[in-house]
């Protein structure tokens, strides 16, 4: 009896390691924490940099003038200082107690219009709109740094998982993510925030590629894989859902470090779960040699699916650095609203990934993705029409639902394309999927700020929306991608219903290939 009791934990642990559902839980939690950290900084960084740098520059300037000459305070003249954070000259009106600053690219002292200052005070807007316009580029680069680093690391993580399995890279991702979260909590400068964001990109690459590849390997049936991917992407959606509102509220009422310390604690729990379930010290390479990464990149069907993921997610990625600052300038929104603006998109994304994870397989994943990209484009065109936070609810909700349609359709398609046309080893193909996702989050924020400065926020939305609408018809090519003959033969035996929509022009009843049809593949190729 005593031995049975002592052996019970070990028996439960052994059963847990053999359970596909617990593997799904591990991946769900990893994606949840990754994307909570990904979005929790969205409302914090713009206002944090404003509080730290803009006000610091102006307060130090006024202290200097107060100590040097009493006559300077009474004078309504304007003086200039050199800003240490973006190499620009700042013109400051000395007679205004709050120190309103305007950014100029020259050393000349051009007086700002008095009406702007009066309007800012009446509407409780943040002062220094010029600073916000300059800051939008730096905020965009900071947000994009995570995706850029993930973009660089992914091509190495995919083949690595093929060699050593998914468990060790998954745990390595947790360790790096934990260090990044702690660094965010105690970073007080732009440089440290940039390093923490870059470190997060490395950890996210390990977690995302290994997690999705692991799911594809344990859920071999296409219907089950679609449901599992939808559930896992639900963790991603929940992270996006909770992250921005959680960050804005905690930053407003508790402080900058609080949300990151809470995430660090949750990451520790995830690490303990991985230690129990995944055995991260065990090297378990794939039994079959995977298709080389560059060979997968030559597959036009994989490229079409990757492009769909990239452009759809670019829609929300380009909003992250630009929408909060646009709201600060045009709506005079308080800090807590900057994160809540993304709440409709996150809720609808959570609904979309879970709903269309099942429906997409019935209606056709290519059609689901095509409709999703059209809705993404239309929603982005409607964003600039909003005059307050309530006007953003409809466009953002449509955007989130549509991206959920695209992601829940394209992620299973990537795995199924490998099953049909290549070797069923999934590390490299999900590295490509993650690269596509990261390209959207790298190109969007890094170029969004520059485009806003050049032609304005509304035109940025028009450009991104039109790109999605124009790309959408390409999803039609995923309707019936041809399979390699030998792959189709295997799939026809195992699950004939799965391959019906993917059959080539040749009737499937002639497969599997017999001796009489040896010449046919050469003819088909």
Curated annotation (Swiss-Prot):
Keywords: Cytoplasmic vesicle, Endoplasmic reticulum, Glycoprotein, Membrane, Neurotransmitter transport, Synapse, Transmembrane, Transmembrane helix, Transport. Glycans are attached at residues 58, 87, 104. It comes from the Eukaryota. It is a multi-pass membrane protein. GO terms for molecular function: monoamine transmembrane transporter activity; monoamine:proton antiporter activity; serotonin:sodium:chloride symporter activity; xenobiotic transmembrane transporter activity. PROSITE patterns: MFS. Residues 43-138, 189-197, 251-256, 320-335, 387-397, 444-448 are lumenal, vesicle. The chain crosses the membrane at residues 22-42, 139-158, 168-188, 198-218, 228-250, 257-279, 300-319, 336-360, 366-386, 398-418, 423-443, 449-470. It is found in: Cytoplasmic vesicle, Secretory vesicle membrane; Cytoplasmic vesicle, Secretory vesicle, Synaptic vesicle membrane. GO terms for cellular component: clathrin-sculpted monoamine transport vesicle membrane; endoplasmic reticulum membrane; presynapse; secretory granule membrane; synaptic vesicle membrane; terminal bouton. Residues 503-525 are annotated as: Disordered. Residues 513-525 have a biased composition (Acidic residues). InterPro entries: MFS (IPR011701), MFS_dom (IPR020846), MFS_trans_sf (IPR036259), MFS_Vesicular_Transporter (IPR050930), Multidrug-R (IPR004734). Its main location: membrane. One of its GO terms (biological process) is dopamine uptake. Expressed primarily in neuroendocrine tissues. Highly expressed in chromaffin cells of the adrenal medulla (at protein level). Detected in peripheral sympathetic ganglia (at protein level). Found in some paracrine cells in stomach and duodenum (at protein level). Expressed in substantia nigra. Residues 1-21, 159-167, 219-227, 280-299, 361-365, 419-422, 471-525 are cytoplasmic. NCBIfam families: 2_A_01_02 (TIGR00880). Belongs to the major facilitator superfamily. Vesicular transporter family. This is Chromaffin granule amine transporter.
């Amino acid at each position: 009896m005593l031995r049975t009791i002592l052996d019970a934990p070990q028996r439960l642990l052994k059963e847990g390691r053999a359970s596909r559902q617990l593997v799904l839980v591990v991946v769900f939690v990893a994606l949840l924490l990754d994307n909570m950290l990904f979005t929790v900084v969205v409302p914090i960084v713009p206002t944090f940099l404003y509080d730290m740098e803009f006000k610091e520059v102006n307060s130090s300037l006024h202290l200097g003038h107060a100590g040097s000459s009493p006559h300077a305070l009474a004078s309504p003249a304007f003086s200039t200082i050199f800003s240490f954070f973006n190499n620009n000259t700042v013109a400051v009106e000395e007679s205004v107690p709050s120190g309103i600053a305007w950014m100029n690219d020259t050393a000349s002292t051009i007086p700002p219009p008095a009406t702007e200052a009066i309007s800012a005070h009446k509407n409780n807007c943040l002062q220094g709109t010029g600073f916000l316009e300059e800051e939008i580029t730096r905020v965009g680069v900071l947000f994009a740094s995570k995706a850029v680093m993930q973009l660089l690391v992914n091509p190495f993580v995919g083949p690595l998982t093929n060699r050593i399995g998914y468990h060790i890279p998954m745990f390595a991702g947790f360790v790096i993510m934990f260090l990044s979260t702690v660094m965010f909590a105690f970073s007080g400068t732009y440089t440290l925030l940039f390093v923490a964001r870059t470190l997060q990109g490395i950890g996210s690459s390990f977690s995302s590629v290994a997690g999705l590849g692991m799911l594809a390997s344990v859920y071999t049936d296409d219907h089950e894989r679609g449901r599992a991917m939808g559930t896992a992407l639900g963790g991603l959606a929940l992270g996006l859902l909770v992250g921005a509102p959680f960050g804005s509220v905690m930053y407003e009422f508790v402080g900058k470090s609080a949300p990151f310390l809470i995430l660090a604690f949750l990451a520790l729990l995830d690490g303990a779960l991985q230690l129990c379930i995944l055995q991260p010290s065990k090297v378990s390479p794939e039994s079959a040699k995977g298709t080389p990464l560059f060979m997968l990149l030559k597959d036009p069907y994989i490229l079409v699916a990757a492009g769909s993921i990239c452009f759809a997610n670019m829609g929300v990625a380009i909003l992250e650095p630009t929408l909060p600052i646009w709201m600060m300038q045009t709506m005079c929104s308080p800090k807590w609203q900057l994160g809540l603006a993304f709440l409709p998109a996150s809720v609808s994304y959570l609904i979309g990934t879970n709903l269309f994870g099942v429906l997409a397989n019935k209606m056709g994943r290519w059609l689901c993705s095509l409709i999703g990209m059209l809705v993404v484009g239309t929603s982005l065109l409607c964003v600039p029409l909003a005059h307050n936070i309530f006007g953003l609810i409809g466009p953002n909700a449509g955007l989130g639902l549509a991206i959920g349609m695209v992601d829940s359709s394209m992620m299973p398609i990537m795995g199924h394309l490998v099953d049909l046309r290549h070797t069923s080893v999934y590390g490299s193909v999900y590295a490509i999927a993650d690269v596509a996702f990261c390209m959207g989050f790298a190109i969007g924020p890094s170029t969004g700020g520059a485009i806003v400065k050049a032609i304005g926020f509304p035109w940025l939305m028009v450009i991104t929306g039109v790109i999605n609408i124009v790309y959408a018809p390409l999803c039609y090519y995923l309707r019936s991608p041809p399979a390699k003959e030998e792959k189709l033969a295997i799939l026809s035996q195992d699950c004939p219903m799965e391959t019906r929509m993917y059959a080539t022009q040749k009737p499937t009843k002639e497969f599997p290939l017999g001796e009489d049809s040896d010449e046919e593949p050469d003819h088909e190729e």
